[in-house]
Amino acid sequence: RQVKFPRTEEITKILENEAKEGEQPIAEIDKGGEDAETDRSKRHKGTRGHIDYRGKTYLAPLTTVGNLPFRRICKGFGVDITCSEMAIATNLLQGQHTEWALLKRHPCEDLFGIQLAGNRSDILGRAAEIVSRECETDFIDLNMGCPIDMAYNNGGGSALMGHPKKISRIVRTMHYVTDCDVTVKFRTGINKNDNVAHTLIPQFEEWGAALGTLHGRSRQQRYTKLADWEYIAQCKKTTNRMPL
């Protein structure tokens, strides 16, 4: 099956011209003028901005744990927002059935998101664009927290924390190509004693992120030691409108 990705092609061209014209605010890029926005709204029925995340319990995405049966159990215990396990953008574009199965949503999941992982804005843009078209999802989440070697050594997951310019391209691309919210999940940083999340959080919002989820450990810590709740509180103070 051959699929077209018109929005990804549009934003890729815009970003390629940035070196000459300078970075534009995401709102300006996304609207493209009143006429363009009117045309776009006719072609796509969007859901962006309809979720009030504040005061809700969020079952954060976690590979091999947050599968559909587990999420159903958690919904029974009162969780408000659920999210799929991490899906690799490249695998989705290759049409791998096992990867697409991760995106299945149960009817009880009234607020549901899909998490994507990758390291290239064009690949993640295409994946986000087709997921936005083909799947029932309220938001699409970017994985910047996975610490496993397979993801990290390929430049994805928590490795992105060391490349702010790449994050900018990815988040802005995903925001442009979808009509639903784009959210981000990330860690404190890569190394234990080198926290960088607080410097990135204000930029996430500028780039179009609607929600941030912070895992209070570095990539180096993986899942060991206690989360740094003091640093989480510090990061919370850096947000403006974006819930953390």
What is each of the regions a protein language model found here?
Residues 1-244:
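Flavin-dependent oxidoreductase catalytic cores
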